[in-house]
A protein has these predicted regions:
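A detector for short, charged/polar N-terminal pre-domain segments
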Residues: 1-3
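Acetyl-CoA-dependent GNAT
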Residues: 5-6, 17-20, 24-93, 98-99, ...
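A short, internal acetyl-CoA/4′-phosphopantetheine-binding micro-motif in the GNAT/acyltransferase core
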Residues: 95-103, 129-130
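Conserved acetyl-CoA-binding loop-helix of GNAT-fold acetyltransferases
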Residues: 103-116, 138-142
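Conserved GNAT acetyl-CoA-binding A-motif
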Residues: 119-128
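Conserved HGGG/HGGXW glycine-rich cap/lid loop of the alpha/beta-hydrolase fold
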Residues: 133
Length: 171
C-alpha cells in the first residue's frame, strides 16, 4: 500500500471504532453549509449526523474495497483519508483535516505518499473535487494533477506516474 510513517511526523493508520467520535467531529467541522440552515441546533446536529452516516454508507457501496485511515501527528488525530487501491487506479475518495492542521502542508505530504504508491503500482492517482473548492483544485494542480473530466458539480483530476504518461492522454 504505502508507508504509514511520513515526512513532517505524520503517521497514517487504519481507522477503528474508537475513532468514530473524532471522525464525526471532523465531518461536523466541514459542514458549515448545513450550520446556516434556518432550523434548531438539535435538528442541524441530527442532520449532520445523518449526512455523516449516509456518506460512509455511500462510500462503502461505491468503493467496497476502500481503506479508511486516520492521519496523526505526534499521536494527535489531525485528519482522515479514504482510499481505494484498485487494479487500474489509486482513488482518493475523501481527505480532510481539522482546522488547526489545514494549510500546513500535511495534505501535500499525504498525497505525495499516495503518488509514490501509485508510481510503484504503475497506475494513476485520481480524485474528485467540487468546482467550488478552488483552493483544493489549485493544490492538486500544483502537485501535478490534471483535470480530465469537468462535469458539474465535481471535477475529476488525475496524476500519472512517469511510466503511464505515454499510455494516457490528459488535457
Amino acid at each position: 500500500m504505502f508507508n504509514n510513517s511520513m515526512q513532517g511526523g505524520l503517521v497514517i493508520r487504519p481507522s477503528n471504532d474508537r475513532d468514530k467520535p473524532f471522525l464525526m467531529n471532523l465531518y461536523n467541522s466541514t459542514r458549515d453549509d448545513l450550520k446556516h440552515v434556518d432550523a434548531s441546533h438539535d435538528f442541524i446536529e441530527e442532520l449532520i449526523e445523518m449526512q455523516f452516516k449516509a456518506q460512509f454508507e455511500g462510500y462503502g457501496e461505491q468503493f467496497p474495497n476502500a481503506f479508511y485511515f486516520v492521519i496523526e501527528r505526534q499521536q494527535e488525530k489531525i485528519g482522515r483519508i479514504a482510499v481505494d487501491f484498485g487494479h487500474n487506479e489509486v482513488r482518493i475518495i475523501d481527505i480532510s483535516f481539522i482546522k488547526a492542521a489545514q494549510n500546513k502542508g500535511y495534505g501535500s505530504v499525504v498525497i505525495n505518499a499516495l503518488k509514490s504508491a501509485a508510481e510503484q503500482n504503475k497506475v494513476p492517482l485520481t480524485l474528485t473535487v467540487l468546482h467550488s473548492n478552488v483552493p483544493a483544485i489549485n493544490l492538486y494542480q500544483k502537485l501535478g494533477f490534471k483535470i480530465v473530466d469537468n462535469k458539474l458539480p465535481h471535477a475529476l483530476l488525475m496524476w500519472l506516474p512517469e511510466s503511464k504518461t505515454a499510455r494516457f492522454s490528459v488535457n
